[in-house]
């Protein structure tokens, strides 16, 4: 369910909102763009270690102080059984920001799980998107040699 909210905003802000909506494309309207930005702003207020940014796949939440989208943080955190302190020992990010990413995931699990799933395209799907894509294997021996110079 939704409600109508009437706001009086400066003309310059309307122009900026229209420009933002055009940049997003896909039939984005001023109203949809405004609602999206309001939702993002509320989420950033509720989760201090999170910020929304433009990315090649659209706007998505990132962990502040990093180049990692929340779905990427969660993929890593799963390797640490979602233990922010353990993860912080191996990664150069404040434990508070890692915790914020995990809390954000707890609140928006379905959305983040969908982003993780979207990232796991198979080779055939990738080939359709990137026709020049070539698949090759690196022998395990070479991987070990590079890991232990």
Region locations from a protein language model:
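Short, basic interhelical loop/turn and adjoining N-cap
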Residues: 27-29, 42, 91-100
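Short alpha-helical "recognition helix" segments of helix-turn-helix
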Residues: 20, 86-89
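Surface-exposed, Lys/Arg-rich phosphate-binding patches that contact polyanionic backbones
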Residues: 11-29
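Short, amphipathic alpha-helical "recognition" segments used to contact nucleic acids or chromatin
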Residues: 66-81
